Design a protein with these regions (language model features):
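Acidic/aromatic-lined carbohydrate-recognition and catalytic surfaces
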Residues: 2-128
Length: 128
């Protein structure tokens, strides 16, 4: 018999992925997300609640997602793509303005999208 998580009190934290520490203009599912998850666990909390993570629409609001099934591509981790050898480690070097603590969707897009295209091209080439 499985235990329902709602049968007992739990504590957690609300942290949107865009707020996770990162160096590419926006938080993502890379090392920063693992740091947050580990910090939540170390604090004795058992839940990580996120705002919607769908592809953002006008105004870059998580509540204006253009799909309820997809994920915002900016939440993909360049570090993991490099670890999987889909992009070169040198592609991780970001301009200093992306390291600021405030999320900047436009600058993150300008930096990450060309790397996503390169990762896809490398994936296709490796799969052929």
């Amino acid at each position: 018999m499985t235990t329902c998580i709602f049968n007992q009190r739990r504590a957690g934290l609300l942290v949107h992925l865009s707020s996770v520490p990162g160096t590419h203009g926006i938080g993502d599912l890379g090392p920063g997300a693992f740091q947050v998850a580990n910090w939540i666990a170390a604090s004795g909390s058992t839940l990580w609640q996120m705002l919607p993570i769908g592809p953002v629409g006008r105004g870059d609001s998580p509540y204006s997602a253009t799909s309820s099934f997809a994920i915002e591509p900016l939440f993909l981790s360049l570090e993991i793509l490099a670890r999987e050898k889909l992009i070169a480690p040198s592609a991780l070097r970001a301009p200093i303005e992306l390291a600021h603590k405030k999320t900047n969707y436009a600058k993150a897009r300008a930096f990450k999208w060309p790397r996503f295209h390169q990762a896809f091209a490398n994936f296709v080439a490796m799969s052929a």
